[in-house]
């Protein structure tokens, strides 16, 4: 019984580790926000990066560099580092993303989490609405979690969500994820307000709320707030 409790505790910590997110401009809220948002809302052929600071003391940096493409599709190398509130590496991610001129995209990434193991994630998104006022995108992902912890098996997490932007100024998102091994569901809501924007620089305020439930443990909605700076080169 004690062994099962320890296993559950370890998995709860591992599954709760942050996925990294980058959009145009960046939108970064922790937990099960969707990694397919590595793909930009519209194709840009510039290298760009972003830095985010959160009110809980965590921070992160991401970079995306185009390496090949055509008039319709761009393939980019992507990477990121998440820092804990003690400025230690919480996660490191690397992978590839493809962006389509119509706002569709896909990515494959590997995330290494010290003390836990690796997560291999395939993700994609489809742009449903895009005009001068509204942008609506649906997305989904599947992750193979590969713990380096003895006696803990590999397991899967799948999820999906929607992202909405109004006049490229105010945004909202909602997502849900399910982890099969411990029957855990994660829920997240997010909001974004663009504070400053030029053709190559964007500053945003981000707000998020998250919760999870399992057959034995449930959480309340937990808030998190932060600011992000993204830059195109």
UniProtKB/Swiss-Prot annotation:
Belongs to the attacin/sarcotoxin-2 family. Residues 18-45 form a propeptide. GO terms for cellular component: extracellular region. One of its GO terms (biological process) is defense response to bacterium. Has antibacterial activity against both Gram-positive and Gram-negative bacteria. Pfam families: Attacin_C, Attacin_N. This is Defense protein 3. It comes from the Eukaryota. Keywords: Antibiotic, Antimicrobial, Cleavage on pair of basic residues, Immunity, Innate immunity, Secreted, Signal. It is found in: Secreted. Residues 1-17 form the signal peptide. The keyword rRNA processing does not apply.
């Amino acid at each position: 019984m004690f062994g099962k409790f320890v296993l559950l505790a370890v998995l709860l910590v591992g599954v709760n580790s942050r996925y990294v997110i980058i959009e145009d401009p960046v939108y970064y809220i922790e937990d099960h926000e969707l990694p397919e948002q590595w793909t930009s809302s519209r194709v840009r052929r510039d290298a760009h990066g972003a830095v985010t600071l959160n009110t809980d003391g965590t921070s992160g940096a991401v970079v995306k560099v185009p390496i090949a493409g055509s008039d319709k599709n761009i393939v980019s190398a992507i990477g990121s580092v998440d820092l804990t509130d003690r400025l230690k590496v919480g996660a490191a991610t690397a992978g590839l993303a493809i962006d389509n001129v119509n706002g569709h995209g896909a990515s494959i990434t590997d995330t290494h989490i010290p003390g836990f193991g690796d997560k291999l994630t395939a993700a994609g998104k489809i742009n449903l609405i895009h005009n001068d006022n509204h942008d609506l995108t649906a997305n989904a992902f599947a992750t193979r979690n590969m713990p380096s912890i003895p006696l803990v098996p590999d397991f899967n997490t799948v999820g999906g969500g929607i992202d909405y932007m109004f006049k490229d100024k105010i945004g909202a998102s909602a997502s849900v994820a399910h982890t099969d091994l411990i029957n855990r569901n994660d829920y997240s809501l997010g909001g974004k307000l663009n504070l400053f924007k030029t053709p190559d620089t964007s500053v945003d305020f981000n707000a998020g709320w998250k919760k999870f439930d399992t057959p034995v443990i449930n959480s309340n909605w937990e808030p998190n707030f932060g600011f992000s700076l993204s830059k195109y080169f």
